[in-house]
């Protein structure tokens, strides 16, 4: 999980979703997991 100020999709399988007021990226590739911090 990478914590970043600005997050974006890395590949076409990345999905931007909102959980508990935080924007996170989920993907089939575990290296692409991100959270806005």
Swiss-Prot record:
GO terms for biological process: translation. GO terms for cellular component: chloroplast; ribonucleoprotein complex; ribosome. Its main location: plastid. Pfam families: Ribosomal_L36 (PF00444). It is found in: Plastid, Chloroplast. Keywords: Chloroplast, Plastid, Ribonucleoprotein, Ribosomal protein. One of its GO terms (molecular function) is structural constituent of ribosome. Belongs to the bacterial ribosomal protein bL36 family. NCBIfam families: rpmJ_bact (TIGR01022). This is Large ribosomal subunit protein bL36c. It comes from Nicotiana tomentosiformis (Tobacco).
